């Protein structure tokens, strides 16, 4: 039988304990690096959230300052939470069942849109803008149509045609090439039919207010946060 001397046992123990210490140090360094990455990611997201909030408040303030005197005349509403301006008078916007812009609405757009886009192209906001949505909305009814499904589809086609007409009209008025290209890259036309109705206090459909056109601003905060999360997952 081989007798292991105490000094050999001690050397083996030292070797094992040394290896264990090295493994613990590696684990500690990995943990620190992992926690550091999480903290860095959280800091980046916090900065984006703060920038988003400041941008939202700034745009809302500037829109309110610019258009307060006009909103009532246009029968329009500014929603600070969604950064949208909503034109609510269907008689001003279009003829019933038609996608052609009324002259009164063209006059409003001639006044509104250049001032609107001037705010968004301000250097403090320009790089934060992801999308400018033109949304067309209708009531749930369609003249002579009893089927709610067919009424929805008819209104979908109409609302899409209307937003396309609005987009074409406002873009055709921009003569500066750089401004045209920037606006074109951000502007979208979205016909939503009766999918987002406006209701009265008693929860009945407000058909007049449901027939509307909205200009809605979307910032790129969500896109930046998703980019950070995607990078950190690699």
Which residues make up each language-model segment?
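Extended, charged coiled-coil scaffold/tether segments in eukaryotic proteins
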Residues: 44-88, 92-96
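Periplasmic OmpA-like peptidoglycan-binding domain that tethers envelope proteins to the cell wall
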Residues: 137-226
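Soluble periplasmic/extracytoplasmic beta-strand elements of cell-envelope proteins
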Residues: 75-77, 84-88, 131-135, 188-190, ...
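Extracytoplasmic/periplasmic, Sec-exported soluble proteins
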Residues: 48-55, 97-108, 154-162, 207
